[in-house]
């Protein structure tokens, strides 16, 4: 709260207070800018300053969680801090600190001493680009990133119908793939909990980096031209970014990971899939045959999606648009369940055949319901192809229809219609395009999560 209210910045999610000391950036809420955050160990030649974060390791009084405080004032050889969960009585009127900690200056270093004798102060964190005396970001040990293969004992667990075909979603999956999760259902892979946390940390940080790169692209025509997006859409793209930067529901980052580290190579920002496989089918597989320790990291995925929809600006009725592809049936149904859990009314549209226009030229479905909010399984690229089919030189605006003699509705007539709120927003085509990778590398050279990439 202190960082947000006083500086308009926040840090990414962490499980425990002591983990804050491993972070190296803050996010500026108003524009998603990434600001450098440096960590200085207790005893550092870099003095603590008012407004800095003070971090304790887990242990003693702060068992398991560690502790975090704000340095509010340097007062002689004392540092005054504000914190929670230590002082449980009201502070004197006008007092803006909870405790005073002794600061010892010796041998060119600054050391803070806690009032508890069983705790360890890790150090302080300052938002600055100056890295002198700062600690490097901790790196996870390579062996903890190893993906390990294992086998279940074959007792015929998957010989029969182990997926419940009476359940519409599971049945849709079976219709597309059969009672199959992979070529050998007895072979599976595991990662360590440390690797899972590293993936979470990397995803959060990279998402902000992709947003930063997207902003740079949309401000530079020369960069935007590299993305092969019809020029007639450029004003729409920029408007989408300005108005709907925080309207994204879901995306999927693809990583390569082994003992050498973790690298991102694609961000499916405008058309993520695999929700059903991760959030349902893998759960059913585990219930059917897995007896070991651990858990499926995606077991709460549908609740997370429902939460994202609850906090979205989607309209009360959402049409779910999918292609006439059997695999997309279960993808659409999984998202429909998330939407319904979030309290939305829904209808799945398979293809575009039932869409048309009413007498006023408004887009309607086969039941006559107005179509004004959609979530799509399609990527944006098929809509771009439709625009490329007609020369954009012939039009001063995107050539969408408000009627047609044969009542034929194209994808662009839905997704690019001004009154239709589409998810994912149009701007997501920028982070979803591989042309973003060289721009990321130019902005964050030698970043540990990036591959060295350039335009050839």
Locate the predicted segments by residue.
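Short hydrophobic alpha-helical module
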Residues: 5-9, 57, 443-446
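Aromatic- and glycine-rich peptidoglycan recognition patches
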Residues: 63-133
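N-terminal capping segments
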Residues: 1-25
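Hydrophobic beta-strand residues in large extracellular and virion-surface proteins
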Residues: 54, 81, 103, 318-320
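Preference for protein termini
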Residues: 132-456
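Acidic Ser/Thr/Pro-rich low-complexity disordered segments
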Residues: 11-13, 89-101, 448-454
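...with weaker cross-activation on analogous glycine-rich loops/strands in unrelated enzymes
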Residues: 18-88
């Amino acid at each position: 709260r202190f960082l947000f209210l006083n500086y308009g910045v926040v840090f990414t999610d962490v499980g425990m207070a002591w983990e804050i000391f491993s972070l190296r950036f803050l996010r500026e809420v108003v524009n998603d800018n990434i600001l450098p955050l440096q960590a200085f160990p207790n005893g550092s030649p870099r003095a603590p300053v008012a407004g800095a974060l003070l971090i304790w390791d887990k242990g003693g009084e702060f068992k398991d969680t560690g502790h975090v405080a704000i340095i509010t004032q340097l007062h002689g050889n004392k540092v005054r801090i504000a914190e929670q969960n230590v002082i449980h009585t009201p502070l004197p009127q006008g007092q803006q600190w909870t405790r005073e900690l002794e600061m010892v200056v010796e041998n060119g270093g600054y050391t803070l001493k806690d009032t508890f004798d069983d705790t360890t102060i890790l150090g302080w964190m300052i938002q600055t680009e100056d890295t002198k005396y700062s600690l490097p970001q901790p790196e996870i040990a390579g062996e903890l990133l190893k993906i390990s293969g294992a086998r279940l004992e074959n007792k015929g667990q998957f010989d029969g119908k182990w997926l419940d075909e009476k359940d519409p979603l599971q049945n849709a999956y079976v219709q597309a793939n059969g009672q199959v999760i992979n070529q050998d259902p007895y072979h599976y892979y595991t990662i360590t909990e440390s690797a899972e946390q590293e993936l979470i940390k990397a995803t959060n940080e990279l998402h902000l980096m992709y947003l930063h790169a997207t902003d740079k692209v949309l401000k530079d025509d020369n960069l935007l031209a590299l993305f092969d997006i019809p020029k007639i859409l450029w004003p729409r793209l920029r408007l989408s970014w300005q108005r709907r930067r925080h309207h994204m529901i879901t995306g999927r980052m693809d990583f390569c990971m082994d003992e050498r580290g973790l690298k991102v190579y694609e961000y499916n920002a405008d058309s993520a899939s695999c929700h059903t496989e991760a959030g349902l089918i893998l759960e059913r597989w585990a219930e059917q045959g897995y007896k070991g320790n651990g858990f499926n990291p995606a077991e709460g995925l549908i609740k997370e999606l429902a939460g994202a929809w609850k906090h979205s600006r989607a309209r009360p009725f959402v049409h779910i648009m999918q292609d006439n592809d059997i695999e997309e049936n279960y993808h659409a149904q999984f998202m429909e369940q998330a939407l319904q859990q979030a309290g939305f009314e829904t209808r799945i549209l398979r293809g575009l055949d039932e869409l048309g226009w009413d007498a006023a030229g408004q887009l309607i479905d086969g039941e006559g319901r107005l179509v004004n909010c959609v979530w799509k399984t399609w990527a944006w690229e098929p809509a771009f192809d439709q625009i490329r089919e007609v020369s954009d030189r012939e039009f001063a605006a995107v050539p969408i229809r408000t009627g047609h003699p044969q009542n034929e509705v194209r994808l662009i007539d839905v997704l690019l219609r001004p009154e239709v709120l589409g998810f994912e927003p149009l701007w997501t085509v920028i982070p979803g395009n591989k042309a973003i990778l060289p721009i990321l590398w130019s902005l964050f050279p030698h970043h540990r999560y990036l591959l060295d990439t350039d335009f050839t």
